[in-house]
């Protein structure tokens, strides 16, 4: 199916209903038209402010409403964040994402957030933040500081959304994405598979993303990480083929976007991850932790890359960053023996 400027639910449902191998073949063809199939973007995610979030997202251990044993932490000092960014770069990351457990940032925190963005960019890394809902002014300030990407996930379809979150409307999420666009910041937005949604809900999520005025440049597809103490802790496991199918449909619908294999990789074996890359995933988070949930260690990722013939993508902001390229090549050669710093530990 050719890429459409605007998708309908029936067209997306038709993709989900395709035989899996046919779907993977189409997704891989689309992927090769727009990307080097051997290149994978490598990002690191750091929790710069952990826990005590007032929202009620049923999947999230950072919500103050659930007893998950997570200790709340205040906003990190700027230099602490920059130190983690330096170590992330040394381990091979080219993109550094900073997440804060807020409904929305307070204006008094904006100067520190701006300094974090400026400092990380000065290291030659792409920058991304996820801070919750933004005002017009906050989005403009982050844009002026040089923020490259802003992450704000839609999570699921509009129809299923109210079963998962009640403290923030779907429209608020869409409004924040619009403000980010208007501030000149690229959009990172995706969702979660395994919330209890139907295939129609998965189609509805991707429909919302692909039909935005400009589709997100980055689309993280998460597999639910079930955390004891959250309302979704006992949800049924996601079938691996259903997850792979979602990746493939996302690739076909948003052919020029990075599709990120995000949370839940710790639960996936190498074969499942390999099929996700075949389905068009071309970005991962690198490091043992995604905010507060487990993620494969860096050396395991590099070993898998080597087995599959994949290479970390060179996307450093500073041109001619040969030192970083040498680090990555060295890491790939020595993946069996080296241990890498967990830049996302908090």
UniProtKB/Swiss-Prot annotation:
Enzyme Commission number(s) of this protein: 2.8.1.6
Cofactor: [4Fe-4S] cluster; [2Fe-2S] cluster
Gene Ontology molecular functions: 2 iron, 2 sulfur cluster binding; 4 iron, 4 sulfur cluster binding; biotin synthase activity; iron ion binding
Pathway: Cofactor biosynthesis; biotin biosynthesis; biotin from 7,8-diaminononanoate: step 2/2
Record: residues binding [4Fe-4S] cluster: 53, 57, 60
Record flagged with keyword GTP-binding: no
Bound cofactor: record note: Binds 1 [4Fe-4S] cluster. The cluster is coordinated with 3 cysteines and an exchangeable S-adenosyl-L-methionine.
Gene3D superfamilies xrefs: Aldolase class I (3.20.20.70)
Family: Belongs to the radical SAM superfamily. Biotin synthase family.
Protein name in UniProt: Biotin synthase
Organism for this UniProt entry: Cronobacter sakazakii (strain ATCC BAA-894)
Gene (UniProt): bioB
């Amino acid at each position: 199916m050719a890429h459409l400027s605007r998708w309908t639910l029936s067209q997306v449902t038709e993709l989900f209903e395709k035989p899996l191998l046919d779907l993977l073949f189409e997704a891989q063809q689309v992927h090769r038209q727009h990307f080097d199939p051997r290149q994978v973007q490598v990002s690191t995610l750091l929790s710069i402010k952990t826990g005590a979030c007032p929202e009620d997202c049923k999947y999230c251990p950072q919500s103050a409403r659930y007893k998950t044993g997570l200790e709340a932490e205040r906003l990190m000092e700027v230099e602490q964040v920059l130190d983690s960014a330096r170590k992330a770069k040394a381990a091979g990351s080219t993109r550094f994402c900073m997440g804060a457990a807020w409904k929305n940032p307070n204006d008094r925190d904006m100067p520190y957030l701006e300094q974090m963005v400026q400092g990380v960019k000065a290291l030659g890394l792409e920058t991304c933040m996820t801070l919750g809902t933004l005002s017009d002014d906050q989005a403009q300030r982050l844009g002026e500081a040089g923020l490259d990407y802003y992450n704000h996930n839609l999570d699921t379809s509009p129809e299923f959304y109210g079963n998962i979150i009640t403290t923030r409307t779907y429209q608020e999420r869409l409004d924040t994405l619009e403000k980010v666009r208007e501030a000149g910041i690229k959009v990172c937005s995706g969702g979660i598979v395994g919330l209890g949604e139907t295939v129609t809900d998965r189609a509805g999520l991707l429909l919302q993303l692909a039909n935005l005025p400009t589709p997100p440049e980055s689309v993280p597809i998460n597999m639910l990480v079930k955390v004891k103490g959250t309302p979704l802790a006992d949800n049924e496991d996601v079938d691996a083929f259903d997850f792979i199918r979602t990746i493939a449909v996302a690739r076909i619908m948003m052919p020029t976007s990075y599709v990120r294999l995000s949370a839940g990789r710790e639960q996936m074996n190498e074969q499942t991850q390999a099929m996700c890359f075949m389905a068009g995933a071309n970005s991962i988070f690198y490091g043992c932790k995604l905010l507060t949930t487990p993620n494969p260690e860096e050396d395991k990722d590099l070993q898998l890359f080597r087995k599959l013939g994949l290479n970390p993508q060179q996307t450093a902001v500073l041109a001619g960053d040969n030192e970083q390229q040498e680090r990555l090549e060295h890491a790939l050669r020595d993946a069996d023996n080296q241990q890498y710093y967990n830049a996302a530990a908090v």
